[in-house]
Amino acid sequence: MLDGLAVPERQVLAWLQPTRPEHFRPDVFPVFNLLVDEGRFYGFPVFGVPGFKFGKYHHLEEIVDPETADREAHDYDEKLLRDFAERYFPGGCGPTMDLQTCMFTNTPDNHFVLDLHPDYPQVSFASPCSGHGYKFASVIGEVMADLAETGITRHDISLFRLDRLTQPSRRPSAMPDFPARSTDGEAYEQNSHSRSFPRVPDVRPFW
């Protein structure tokens, strides 16, 4: 169903030993997402596991087969990441402690897919997260619980419908043509079932 819409991509992360470790403690160094001439990078303070951890979104833009993807990190991977650290975080650019590969699974617009199956509306799914799903795990879990229990959710997930990537007319969706959340306690109809939601405070989009 997601063939061609969920594209696996090889990623590489580095852990470097800071030469100025006092600058990379969690109380002084933030989680960052940095867009620079070389691309978009993300990283974290030293926490739990030793080392300044960071990577580059889309790394070398290598589309891979998950069954045969290169799981080794190479000298050219290390050079790309160290060049970034030397320029922007020189105090974090000590010896390389570790390099690890992983995969992002990206949609064409880099957004999530959260919806009901177009042919089997009793099935809900959440994939892929395009490399930025972890920080939304709690609310995605809430959305998926809503969909599993009622087929709709109080969160506005219209941005993440499957049909934005496929054909606009062939599915029941988690976001039909009425609000997914009632603020006045009125009922809405979906699939011959009445759904009623009590008044709740306005919910801001989670993305």
Question: What residue spans do the PLM features occupy?
Answer:
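Active-site substrate-recognition segment that forms the wall
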Residues: M1-Q122, R181-S192, F197-V203, W207
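C-terminal lid/capping helical subdomain adjacent to the catalytic/cofactor pocket in oxidative enzymes
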Residues: P118-W207
